[in-house]
Amino acid sequence: MALTQLGNHPKEELALVEIATAILSEHKTVMPFSSLVEEIQDFLAVDAETFQSRLSQFYTDLNTDGSFISLGNNEWGLRAWYPVDAIDESIHEIDDDDDAPKRKKAAKKVNVFADSAADDDVIDYNDDDPEDEDFGEVTEEETDVDVDDSEVEVEDDEEEEIAVGDDETIDDNLTELTGTNDLDDLSDGDIEK
């Protein structure tokens, strides 16, 4: 679709991605995003301030629309121009520059508490691992506890006194409850049959 074919439609009703597709088809080459935006502004005959409010949505549509492809350096083209294999190759060409592995030196650990490197009195805190400590092992010697039965005092008198007094009150409460139905108090007024 060329810009001349878009002239038949009202410009306000056209989507910006449709206009971008027509512009890229007419130029038949990739374009930087800024040039593409300028071409769209010229076609719509709007100034930059008016177009600014639609710019972020246009960029989002450009990324999500399947008919466009970003070729790096903010250059855009039509996906139809590139077969799938060529797309992979062009992406890998950009990545080839970054293939040289960059190795970083491991940071040497320094003990800030040491006066000198040869100081033997310094505690090495790197060897302390709280997960290595064994708190769960218990020997038989630790579990054997000698208890003398004569030292343990049990007071049976109090339990007997409580038991006698409680039997009478429990029986009284049971006789009071047997005649009532607690669910009747919560009913909505319907009579049970």
Swiss-Prot record:
Coiled coil: none
Limits of the HTH HARE-type domain: 14-81
GO biological process: one example: regulation of DNA-templated transcription
Signal sequence bounds: none
Biased composition (Acidic residues): 119-174, 182-193
Family of the protein in this entry: Belongs to the RpoE family.
Role description: Participates in both the initiation and recycling phases of transcription. In the presence of the delta subunit, RNAP displays an increased specificity of transcription, a decreased affinity for nucleic acids, and an increased efficiency of RNA synthesis because of enhanced recycling.
Name the record gives this protein: Probable DNA-directed RNA polymerase subunit delta
Species whose genome carries this gene: Leuconostoc citreum (strain KM20)
Lineage summary: Bacteria, Bacillati, Bacillota, Bacilli, Lactobacillales
